[in-house]
């Protein structure tokens, strides 16, 4: 099984949140979306300690603008089978015996654990654990604590950068233990690196070695893991790393144990190259991984379907991620390449301006500066769609909760893009709210006929032999003799000389609509 979903109501900094997890999940979002509260909900309940966690007053959410906390909070954990009919396995018999598995339409059974907290009239705090049936009602179970402990033992949560991993005697043993072979030496190097980068104990610096050599050993281990067809090496690494974790009578690392590892902003401590090595290493472990990050480098290594974007609103925290049905295989492949290699930073934006090519990217960027519009501060990103296609990008933006607006040329291709936008619009949404179609064949011709012909003539080094000026030929030569960025800067400089009133009205309206969408 793996953790499939978590519902949070009234816990710490989260008023409401419903989030779907996959075996490997990366969470991104602006500050204050509730990251610490979400990670705490996971690590406190599945804490691998001997006692079930009991809520305290600080766990109850205080709504915005109020001084009093809510009186009731709920955490609902949904676990899902990895394989159909997993309930037949020996290790699931206790859950089957109490009829805790619930059928689901997708054929994979679910297990629901609800943890509730309540403040009574005497200000006493009560915590209740229960398993739910298909109707959401608590299943009567006499040995509820024992069943909850068994679930925690299967899926203990370990939070890297967490004080519970701060165990200097483990670190000391790692350094002084006898190394028998190259493989054990490489595994030990990985363990030392984890201690060095993710433990915050004052004595950790005493155990560090040459980290360059350690990372080299970790990289060698990656190559061996990739060739490990029997998975024996993966298991050896897993059980070696298990020595870093808390041990008690309930936690026994076996073939059915699947810990949930929380990596909290690993990029904050690691160089991008080191992030890549560590990321590949942990991908071989039989764990469920949940990572928070603001790293473009890390995002570029993650499958699009594993990225979840979280946005906090006044009433709740919304989670957005790509569904398996949102894109076909070809669109997914093209979009993945485009995002990973060119536009990872765009995933951290709340608004996309989708344009056909490089020229539009440069010109719109320069126009925004002249209008004193800081696109980065506004969360706006200009994204070129020529490589991946317009429709997949709009689909992805909608799935991830990113607002979007399209700028296209006035040629046949532009009219086709207009039809794509029309199909993607929600009912009753005017086409003009999502797209601007230039009244000329492209943006260069638009500027040429709107008072900036002299810029193109100058850049083209055009020597007039008559009063005839072939517009298209001059534009082509201007681009050939300079570059698209240089053309954009030249137009920007000319507009700066004339004043912002010379910016064509169509672009002022475009930015006005974009800002309106970005602030909704």
Identify the meaning behind each predicted range.
Residues 418-490:
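Activity-critical C-terminal alpha-helical subdomain
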Residues 364, 369, 461-520:
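Charge-patterned, long linear interaction tracts outside catalytic cores
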């Amino acid at each position: 099984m793996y953790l499939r979903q978590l519902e949070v109501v009234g816990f710490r900094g989260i008023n409401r949140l419903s989030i779907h997890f996959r075996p490997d999940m990366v969470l991104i979002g602006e500050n204050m979306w509730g990251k610490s509260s979400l990670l705490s909900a996971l690590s406190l309940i599945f804490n691998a300690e001997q006692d079930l966690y009991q809520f305290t007053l600080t766990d109850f959410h205080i709504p915005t603008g109020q001084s009093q906390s809510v009186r009731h909070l709920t955490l609902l954990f949904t676990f899902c089978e990895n394989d159909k009919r997993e309930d037949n396995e020996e290790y699931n018999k206790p859950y089957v015996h109490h009829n805790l598995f619930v059928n689901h339409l997708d054929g994979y059974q679910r297990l629901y654990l609800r943890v509730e907290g309540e403040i009574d009239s005497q200000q006493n705090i009560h915590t209740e654990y229960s398993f739910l049936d298909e109707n959401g009602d608590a299943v009567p179970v006499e040995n509820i604590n024992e069943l909850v402990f068994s679930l925690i033992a299967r899926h203990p949560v370990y939070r890297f950068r967490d004080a519970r991993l701060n165990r200097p005697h483990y670190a000391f043993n790692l350094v002084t233990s006898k190394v028998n072979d190259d493989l054990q030496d490489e595994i030990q190097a990985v363990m030392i690196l984890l201690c060095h980068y993710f433990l915050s104990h004052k004595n950790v610096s005493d155990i560090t070695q040459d980290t360059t050599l350690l990372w080299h050993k970790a990289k060698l281990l990656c190559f061996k893991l990739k060739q490990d067809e029997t998975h024996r090496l993966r298991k050896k690494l897993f059980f070696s790393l298990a020595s870093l974790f808390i041990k008690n009578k309930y936690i026994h690392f076996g073939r059915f144990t699947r810990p949930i590892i929380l990596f909290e902003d690993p990029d904050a401590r690691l160089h991008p190259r080191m992030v890549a090595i560590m990321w590949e290493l942990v991908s071989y472990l039989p764990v469920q991984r949940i990572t928070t990050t603001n790293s473009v480098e890390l995002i570029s290594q993650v499958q699009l379907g594993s990225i979840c974007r979280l946005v906090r609103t006044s009433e709740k925290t919304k989670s957005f991620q790509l569904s398996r049905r949102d894109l076909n295989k070809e669109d997914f492949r093209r979009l993945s390449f485009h995002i990973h290699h060119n536009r990872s930073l765009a995933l951290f934006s709340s608004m996309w301006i989708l344009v056909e090519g490089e020229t539009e990217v440069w010109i719109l960027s320069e126009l925004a500066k002249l209008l004193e519009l800081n696109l980065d501060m506004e969360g706006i990103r200009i994204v070129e769609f020529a490589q991946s296609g317009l429709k997949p990008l709009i689909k992805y933006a909608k799935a991830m909760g990113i607002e979007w607006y399209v700028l296209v040329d006035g040629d046949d291709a532009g009219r086709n893009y207009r039809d794509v936008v029309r199909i993607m619009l929600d009912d009753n949404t005017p086409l003009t709210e999502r797209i601007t179609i230039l009244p000329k064949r492209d943006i260069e011709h638009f500027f040429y006929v709107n008072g900036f012909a002299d810029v193109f003539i100058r850049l083209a080094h055009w020597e007039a032999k008559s009063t005839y000026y072939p517009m298209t030929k001059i534009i082509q030569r201007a681009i050939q003799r300079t570059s698209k960025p240089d053309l954009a800067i030249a137009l920007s400089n000319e507009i700066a000389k004339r004043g912002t009133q010379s910016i064509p009205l169509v672009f002022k309206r475009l930015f006005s609509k974009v800002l309106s969408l970005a602030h909704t």
